[in-house]
């Protein structure tokens, strides 16, 4: 699949163009320069052609904490790309930063296709000299308005004209999981270690990752997509509009995932924010693995330390009692393999299908062995159970009247199912239904 990178100085509309090509809001857009810090990836489609699109941070000469990292990210993107969109702004005109980028592209991307694109032509005033644009040496250029969609058809035709027709089946085959956690627990370091490269900017300042980033990779011939997300802070501390949108992005990333890696910082006491983020994982009702990061930073460890930390986690995160716990040191690349062992272990449980006859044998016996308590004027009696298709093990239980069900008895039946069929590391869902009501498809 061909790769296209969008580069340019800050605030020329790179993220707006990225979103326009994808026809959805993937990159954060704000009139504040420097909003995009990392490389953002997604697959675009035009005229039955598929391509990987990369949004990058703005290149400038600056003493900003992140600027050297941003410039490095852009160079990574240029190296990955087959085609580069060099974006400038009709509204702001050409300045020294544009000229430096043009010079850099001639040096670093001399063997690649470079398309000069003039954005923001909806502006009433132009500050561009076309002779100056031709002097860059990139030949024909395209005038567009990413915000309003003007000129996009011609640009997209140019981008895909030499591309082969490609489908998107590979993307669909990948197992997708996301990394979540409060800021500065090491989510980006973990992503970088897994991917084996510096794809996500890592900085000691909490909140240095603002976008969620899809990264495709293979691990021992298995295909994965990992989503690195913005760290979630307590709502009262989020003041920037961009940060608010990043929190929403994290929640959306969870919705797109098949599994969650909840990262905790093992080198310090767990915080209230950790429990808040854990609540998001619980509410998502999908498989979750708890990752205790920075394990090597814990001093004076002994043979009992790991078990003590596990007990502490089980106490603070009671609602994730089924989630496996893995201990790693992302920066030192230690015990990373245990994450994938846990992922595959959990995947197998989540996909496990139980024969209806076996289910009924276990549940009907459990119902007879422990008589349910009377509740709301009646007593529950289970007639039948069947597993239904879902992302996690999900069961429909037919009974005489669901209103007679007490939560403690529902928990008893759930535990019996877990024990009998080995569902000890995934969430499971039970739906209690009146036996006279038909299931869809019956």
Curated annotation (Swiss-Prot):
Q: Which UniProt keywords apply?
A: GTP-binding, Nucleotide-binding, Repeat, Ribosome biogenesis
Domain of life, per UniProt, equals Bacteria
* Molecular-function GO terms, alphabetical: GTP binding; ribosome binding
Q: Which residues bind GTP 1?
A: 8-15, 55-59, 119-122
Tell me which residues make up the KH-like domain. Answer: 352-436
| Stored CDD domains | EngA1, EngA2
- The answer to whether the entry has keyword Nucleotide-binding is yes
Keyword Nucleus assigned to the entry: answer is no
Kindly list the positions annotated as binding GTP 2: 181-188, 228-232, 293-296
Q: Name one Pfam family in it.
A: MMR_HSR1
User: Family assignment?
Assistant: Belongs to the TRAFAC class TrmE-Era-EngA-EngB-Septin-like GTPase superfamily. EngA (Der) GTPase family.
The entry describes its oligomerization and partners as: Associates with the 50S ribosomal subunit.
Sum up the protein's function in the record's words: GTPase that plays an essential role in the late steps of ribosome biogenesis.
Q: What is this protein called?
A: GTPase Der
Q: What species is this protein from?
A: Ureaplasma parvum serovar 3 (strain ATCC 700970)
């Amino acid at each position: 699949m061909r790769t296209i990178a969008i580069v340019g100085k800050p605030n020329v509309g790179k993220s707006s163009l990225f979103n326009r090509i994808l026809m959805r809001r993937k990159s954060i857009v704000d009139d504040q320069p420097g909003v995009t810090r990392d490389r953002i990836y997604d697959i675009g489609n035009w005229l039955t052609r598929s391509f990987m699109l990369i949004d990058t941070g703005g290149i400038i000469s600056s003493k900003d904490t992140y600027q050297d990292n941003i410039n490095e990210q852009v160079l990574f993107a240029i190296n990955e790309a087959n085609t580069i969109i060099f974006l400038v702004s009709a509204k702001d005109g050409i300045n020294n930063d544009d000229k430096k980028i043009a010079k850099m592209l001639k040096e670093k991307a001399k063997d690649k296709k470079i398309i000069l694109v003039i954005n923001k032509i909806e502006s009433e005033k132009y500050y561009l000299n076309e002779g100056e644009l031709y002097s860059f040496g990139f030949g024909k250029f395209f005038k567009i308005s990413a915000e309003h969609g003007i000129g996009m058809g011609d640009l997209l035709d140019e981008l895909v004209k030499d591309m082969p027709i490609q489908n998107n089946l590979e993307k669909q085959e990948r197992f997708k999981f996301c990394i979540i956690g409060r800021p500065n627990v090491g989510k980006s370091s973990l992503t970088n270690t897994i991917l084996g490269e510096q794809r996500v900017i890592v900085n000691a300042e909490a909140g240095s990752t603002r976008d969620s980033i899809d990264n495709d990779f293979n691990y021992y011939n298995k295909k994965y997509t990992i989503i690195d997300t913005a760290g979630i802070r307590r709502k009262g501390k989020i003041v920037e509009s961009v940060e608010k949108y990043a929190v929403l992005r994290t929640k959306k990333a969870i919705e797109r995932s098949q599994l969650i890696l909840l990262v905790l910082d093992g080198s310090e006491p767990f915080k209230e924010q950790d429990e808040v983020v854990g609540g998001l994982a619980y509410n998502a009702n999908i498989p979750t693995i708890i990752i205790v990061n920075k394990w090597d930073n814990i001093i004076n460890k002994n043979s009992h330390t790991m078990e003590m930390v596990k007990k502490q986690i089980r106490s603070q995160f009671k609602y994730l009692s089924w989630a496996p716990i893995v201990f790693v040191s992302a920066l030192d690349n230690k015990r990373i393999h245990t994450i994938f062992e846990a992922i595959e272990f959990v995947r197998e449980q989540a996909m496990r299908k139980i024969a209806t006859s076996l289910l009924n044998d276990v549940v009907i016996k459990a119902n007879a062995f422990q008589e349910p308590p009377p509740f709301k004027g009646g007593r529950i009696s289970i007639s039948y159970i069947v597993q239904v298709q879902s992302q996690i093990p999900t069961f429909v239980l037919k009974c005489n009247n669901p209103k007679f069900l007490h939560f403690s008895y529902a928990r008893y039946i759930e535990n019996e199912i877990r024990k009998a069929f080995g569902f000890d590391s995934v969430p499971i869902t039970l739906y209690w239904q009146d036996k006279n009501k038909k299931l869809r498809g019956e």
